[in-house]
């Protein structure tokens, strides 16, 4: 069982007011935050903390991760005419964002050559 604690008294003053997660089954403690000597997420044997007094901190446990499968699809929905107009009148489309090789980019930030390339690759007559 995992218990959240705040150390209230310890021989090592760097531990006072630090927060930990205690794993009773493994006899380990995971540092949530401490003033010094311990890094966030560092796991140590409980015995390494020495003589301590603590108060329990309520933990909000979330259910385990449920994997349902599925896929992710990213679609650009626009017309060729919109991109061509954005080339001619960039001031009309300051927020026009497109996907290029998996990255989001402002269409107006592309060079004219890159803009033509995007239009050519995005809108084809046949597969």
UniProtKB/Swiss-Prot annotation:
Task: Report domain Glycine radical positions.
Answer: 5-127
GO molecular-function annotation terms? Answer: formate C-acetyltransferase activity
Q: Which UniProt keywords apply?
A: Organic radical
Name this protein carries in UniProt: Autonomous glycyl radical cofactor
Domain of life here?
Bacteria
Q: Note the InterPro entries from the entry.
A: Auton_GlycylRad_Cofactor (IPR050244), Form_AcTrfase_GR_CS (IPR019777), Gly_radical (IPR001150), Glycyl_radical_cofactor_GrcA (IPR011140)
Kindly name one Pfam family recorded for this protein. Answer: Gly_radical
Q: Does the keyword Transcription apply?
A: no
Biological function? Acts as a radical domain for damaged PFL and possibly other radical proteins.
Q: Which residues carry this modification: Glycine radical?
A: 102
Fetch the SUPFAM superfamilies from UniProt.
PFL-like glycyl radical enzymes
Report one GO cellular component: cytosol
